[in-house]
Amino acid sequence: MAACVKTNKSHVIFKKVSRDKSVTIYLGKRDYIDHVSQVEPVDGVVLVDPELVKGKKVYVTLTCAFRYGQEDIDVIGLTFRRDLYFSRVQVYPPVGAMSAPTQLQLSLLKKLGDNTYPFLLTFPDYLPCSVMLQPAPQDVGKSCGVDFEVKAFATDITDAEEDKIPKKSSVRLLIRKVQHAPPEMGPQPCAEASWQFFMSDKPLHLSVSLSKEIYFHGEPIPVTVTVTNNTEKVVKKIKVSVEQIANVVLYSSDYYVKPVASEETQEKVQPNSTLTKTLVLVPLLANNRERRGIALDGKIKHEDTNLASSTIIKEGIDRTVMGILVSYHIKVKLTVSGFLGELTSSEVATEVPFRLMHPQPEDPAKESVQDENLVFEEFARQNLKDTGENTEGKKDEDAGQDE
């Protein structure tokens, strides 16, 4: 009988090399989780070629920026960008006392050998998560949204400015700061509303309920609707939709309300009768790709993402620095016959809030990083669950293009 051999799970390491091969950066992941109380730090290593660096210093920076995007151009024709956060650490030559390397860094230091230097970058708790507003297909340039960039570069200029850093000796990577569903859900969402119509003694009553407060991306959302029609009118149609509300709070407090999924029934509710119906909605980016202004979780280059997750704000944090706040609700709209019966109609509606998020990932403490299980991959985004599509990330030993 064959022996049972336990295999350890491979750990993908994302790498990127500068054009002149002087610096190579390695990260263990691309998404960093905001747990509201604290945010995962960015830990990685930089491999330096001493012959090519030739006495220069090597730095790693973390930048959070809000881009106003194609639609918001100032009077001199420049796309506006506002840096919300910037930090920099020198990794070569090492300076000061180094913190204890993480398990990932220890494995990379052992795997890559000499001339490898660890770094650790932290997020303050007031920064927004990665989010962007989807441009129209014909739009060009940067999209409106919040992004995070890690950059490694070699320079001999003290306090080097962005435009003075030699591009051939630098490499930049877009990463994401993301939130996941909290471990405990809130109360089951529900709403009730009544409307009194002219020449009807009794009201039209609508009750809407969801099975839970948080749904995961790609998960069906069953919406139970009960219409109690005590009027003399006919409810001709019931339409249920998921609406996304994106509030751009940083500069103008604009609201973008976009339906991202809808279902309807033509089943009529006659006077003095009751109907209970459950309609199922699945909000997906795949069904909203051509629509401008839909909020998405931050994306990198041409790789896929998903509809933006609901925003959770830490208590006491100023909302105006959060970039774009995203929320969702279910909207139920009834079409009711008017004075002339089938020839005219009126509409009434009510809303039920809920949250759309990613599930909590596996506990990283349960995962071990083994030297022999490191797989190096080009820094390119993977598809996420709600796109309805599935493509494989391309692997490459020396990914040199900027993202």
UniProtKB/Swiss-Prot annotation:
SMART domains linked: Arrestin_C
Record Gene3D superfamilies: 2.60.40.640, 2.60.40.840
InterPro entries attached to this UniProt entry: Arrestin, Arrestin-like_C, Arrestin-like_N, Arrestin_C-like, Arrestin_CS, Arrestin_N, Ig_E-set
Subcellular location: Cell projection, Cilium, Photoreceptor outer segment; Membrane
Region of interest called Disordered, as start-end residue ranges on this chain: 381-403
A Pfam match: Arrestin_C
PROSITE patterns tied to this protein: ARRESTINS
Keyword Phosphoprotein set for record: yes
A Gene Ontology biological process term: signal transduction
GO molecular function: G protein-coupled receptor binding; opsin binding; phosphoprotein binding; spectrin binding
Record's signal peptide: none
Organism domain of life: Eukaryota
Tissue specificity remark: Retina and pineal gland.
Modified residues (Phosphothreonine): 231
A GO cellular component entry from the record: photoreceptor outer segment
Subunit (UniProt): Monomer. Homodimer. Homotetramer. Interacts with RHO (via the phosphorylated C-terminus).
Similarity comment: family membership: Belongs to the arrestin family.
Domain notes: The C-terminus interferes with binding to non-phosphorylated RHO. Interaction with phosphorylated RHO triggers displacement of the C-terminus and leads to a conformation change that mediates high-affinity RHO binding.
Function: Binds to photoactivated, phosphorylated RHO and terminates RHO signaling via G-proteins by competing with G-proteins for the same binding site on RHO. May play a role in preventing light-dependent degeneration of retinal photoreceptor cells.
Protein name stated in the entry: S-arrestin
